[in-house]
Amino acid sequence: MRHLLLITAFLAMLGPTSAHAEGSESLWDGLQVHGFASQAAIWTSENRFFGNSPETSFAFTEIGLNASLPINPRILLSGQLLARRAGDMYDGTPELDYGLADITLASSNEQRWGVRVGRVKNPLGIYNETRDVPFTRPGIFLPQVIYYDKIRNLALSTDGLMFYGESYIDQGALSLTLGGGQPVIDDNVGWTFLRNNYDGEFQTDNKTGLVQLWYSTPGERFKFGLSGIMLSLRFDPGQHSPLRSGTTDIFYWIASIQYDTEDWTLSAEYLREPLAWDDYGPLFPNFKTTVEGYYLQGTYRIRPNIELLMRYEEGFANRNDRDGVRFSTRTGGLFPPFAGFSKIWTAGLRWDINRQWMVRAEYQRHHGTFVLSFRENPDLGQLREYWNLFAVQAAFRF
């Protein structure tokens, strides 16, 4: 990452020279700065979600500040700092959400080719690139069976390179992105993939790659795409770890489709995620599974500033074990069967008070606990199969 930042700084130094040479306007005239903040209150009938939600949790806060600066017609610098508090998973420490140089290599009326260098948001699915901005999400929470908050950072961004191409024809637009680099790893990785906080740390095993292909009709009324990321994680055990040095291989891919009109939007996505654990030792035997998730979602704008949301989603820790029985048996009954799946109905309301302020309300009916974080729910005996969630959120932007 240090080398990427040096490259970005070098490009920034080149930019002012080009701008002054053109003698037209100051480099800083194109600077844009924006920000947002949101606060939510979350209540659940059972189980912990974004904090101590059975007692009502206020531990979901987002504060972001972003800026963009065109150095010259071919180079755009942009970045965002984000402070995000999400229950026990994220503590609100400000972090670099993204910071990159977008370099156009070739451009015409029919196509554009370029490369993004730095910490780049992964273009996975419909919502991953904009998931941290409350105003661009369809609800307070994204579909958790695909956009996991319990392990958000791993799929969120990459420190590396993203090459992209866009082609514009009479029938619409076609875009392709190819990239690779280092994912962002935090403590939630261990809690999710090893189901505990073992002594040791994860590192990437130099096998990270990303691809995205999108097609959209003119006006983007209809669009569909395929996107995926492949990575290998290596666990380096600490002195007191009962595990050996093992690897977890991940192939996370999404098929997406969306139809948009003036008053309503229909979206559907399908996730498949093959996983393989190897060489962790007898406490965590070698194992392979394929996670599966999908949702169907509709939003309807009854007024320009009022929007209704309805969504149904399902997710499974093993697509061949949809009732979770084999999952529970494999762990000796430590995990209840319903920890292997989630089936969720969601209804929501959005009200844009004005351009700066928005409020939301959302209700969810859950069957299963697959989407929950083990970090927030370490006592598996306290988990309940059926539970409700109600949340409200206020958001501001400038």
Can you name each region flagged by the protein language model?
Residues N128-R131, V189-W191, D321-D323, S373:
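Short aromatic-enriched loop/helix-cap "lid" or pocket-rim segments at secondary-structure transitions
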Residues M13-P54, I126, P337, I353-W357, ...:
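Outer-membrane beta-barrel biogenesis signature
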Residues T192-P237:
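Loop-centered beta-sheet repeat module
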Residues M1-S24, G139:
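Cleavable N-terminal export/targeting peptides
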Residues S24-V33, A40-W43, P54-D186, K207, ...:
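Outer membrane beta-barrel
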Residues A173-T177, D187-T192, P237-G238, Y280:
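A short secondary-structure junction signal
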Residues E55-T56, I151-L154, E201-T204, S245-T247, ...:
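Short Gly/Pro-enriched turn/cap motifs at secondary-structure boundaries
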Residues G51-N52, L100-I103, G225-F398:
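Outer-membrane beta-barrel pore domains
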